[in-house]
């Protein structure tokens, strides 16, 4: 019997997939607020859920999306789950944004030059 071994995905495909997950995770206002709060300090899931008008299970699902995107690390101590931000996961998104930031900066500078004349 022939065994099928898929070839590993090229590194660029993996980077693109991770970038897609990061932007998808950050597309939701609740998840952006969770990231904002975790940027300040490590929190329990219960602490993270407190300000939201949703169930603990719903907040936990949002956290799972952030985990899948590599933005959040969850650790367990007894029955308590602690979450912390993994800021290095934002590097790819920041690099992507920087490309377009430079692009638009150049465009606006060119426009400013045209308007001066």
Question: What residues fall within each predicted segment?
Answer:
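N-terminal helix-turn-helix DNA-binding core of bacterial DNA-binding proteins
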Residues: 2, 17-57, 80-95
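Amphipathic alpha-helical dimerization/coiled-coil segments
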Residues: 1-18, 36, 91-117
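Beta-hairpin "wing" of winged helix-turn-helix
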Residues: 67-78, 82-84
